[in-house]
Amino acid sequence: MANEDDDGEKSRSLHQQIARKPKTQIVIGVPSYQEVLESSQTKSTPPSLFKPSQSFSQAFAFVKSSDVYSPPPPSSAAASSSQPSGASQVPHSSSQTHQTDGASSSSTPVATGSVPSNTTQNRNAILVSHRQKGNPLLKHIRNVKWVFSDIIPDYVLGQNSCALYLSLRYHLLHPDYLYFRIRELQKNFKLSVVLCHVDVEDTVKPLLEVTKTALLHDCTLLCAWSMTECARYLETIKVYENKPADLIQGQMDTDYLSRLNHSLTSIRHVNKSDVVTLGSTFGSLAHIIDASMEDLARCPGIGERKVKRLYDTFHEPFKRATSSYPSVVEPPIPEAPVEKDVNSEEPVEEDEDFVEDSRKRKKKEPEPEKTVKTALSAVFARYSDRLSKKKEKQKEKDTTTASDAETHQN
């Protein structure tokens, strides 16, 4: 009972103390809309614990302090530069070395990366001179890139090939233009192409002049009759810049039988079976060449025509024996009409000299070598002789007819 009374007294005393304390006012502040926006905007991001290094050497600097790391051998240039200086040089701090290494490593890729990009673009593209601005040919170059550049020729198609564009219409106005343009090249290119656009109707004289100029200056002439054809030439030369010459080179077999077959089948009427027969009979090409016509005729399947072809091919001289003077062709001689007398019953006599000459011409006897002057003089002399003989015979006939008429009148 005593304990319960004590607890009741304590609780009463606590209630009395709480009641005696002054009551404090609690105020809750509500922020405005602007204060909320400002607080959200000025909210700072939490600091990140990741600190990236400035260079590759700084990022992997801990490798040098490990036991596994071994320094690389010094280069020849570094060794030569370090020998005269000796030990007087003061080593820089590790931070400075790292910074210099980082600067050099970061700067070199930029410099080396920018140059190859330009060079590769120029290598894969046709370099066009600024002189060709406005040329409609450039619109037709579609399969290959082209770039304007400060170059001497009109087009640079590779390291050793270039092209000069020429219009025949422009050549007629300026005949010396091509000569001066070729002279500017100064043989700096192995392949110099003159791309000639034929845009005139009368092409004989201008093409002759362009061909002569190109040949005298070791240039290759390519003629095109349209702008698209000119563009195809430029594209093809650029595409085949680094191609080997296997496409145009003849491929020769290495074995003896195929070479023998290739050489003997070039003779007319000789086939592959004949080559096998000749090879098995004589053994080699030298024995086939030295064989006589009788030996060749003994081979089965080779007739007289093939024997003659083979023998003539192996024994005829390579160079034909031609005369030093050009062969002279005699012009046809006009025949004078022979007047027939209706009253006379005598047959018309033919000129004996004319008949003999015609027979000789039919036989085609070989005449001695003549020059043009001697041949013409001989022809005119014969012609004058024949005319004089015919005139004399005509006069004799006229006199005989006149005398016959007088006798009939008497």
UniProtKB/Swiss-Prot annotation:
Region annotation (Disordered) ranges: 1-28, 66-121, 322-410
Feature: compositional bias, Polar residues: 92-121
Enzyme Commission (EC) number: 3.1.-.-
Keyword Protein transport: no
Bias (Low complexity) ranges: 76-91
Compositional bias annotation for Basic and acidic residues: 356-372, 383-410
Entry's localization field: Nucleus
CDD domains linked: ERCC1_C-like
GO biological process: double-strand break repair via homologous recombination; non-photoreactive DNA repair; nucleotide-excision repair, preincision complex assembly; response to gamma radiation; response to UV-B
Assigned keywords, A-Z: DNA damage, DNA excision, DNA recombination, DNA repair, DNA-binding, Endonuclease, Hydrolase, Nuclease, Nucleus
Gene3D superfamilies: 3.40.50.10130, 5' to 3' exonuclease, C-terminal subdomain
Single Gene Ontology MF annotation: damaged DNA binding
Family label: Belongs to the ERCC1/RAD10/SWI10 family.
UniProt-listed PANTHER family: DNA EXCISION REPAIR PROTEIN ERCC-1 (PTHR12749:SF0), EXCISION REPAIR CROSS-COMPLEMENTING 1 ERCC1 (PTHR12749)
Record protein name field: DNA excision repair protein ERCC-1
Gene: ERCC1
